[in-house]
Amino acid sequence: MPKIVATHEVEDVAHWLASPKRAEVFDGIATDIRTFVHPTEKNRVAVAFDVADMDKFEAVLKSEAGAAAMKYDGVRPETIVVYIEG
């Protein structure tokens, strides 16, 4: 099960941290979801996941539900960078 780390910018870090949407949209696809905030760049964050099925993970990112969750969370989609454990 690879670990995925995604970095991106958000509109409001406190809102993003408190949001239940991450867990809802990745339920059954990702486990051990952990959040991180950049210490000096106030809107840069990261999230780490353990993902069993990369195809399902990528499908969520491209889905309407994924887009709605990102919008709700204030994610700036154009800033997303995904890293896969090597």
What residues fall within each predicted segment?
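Short S/T/G/P-rich N-terminal loop/turn motif that feeds into the first structured element of a domain
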Residues: M1-G86
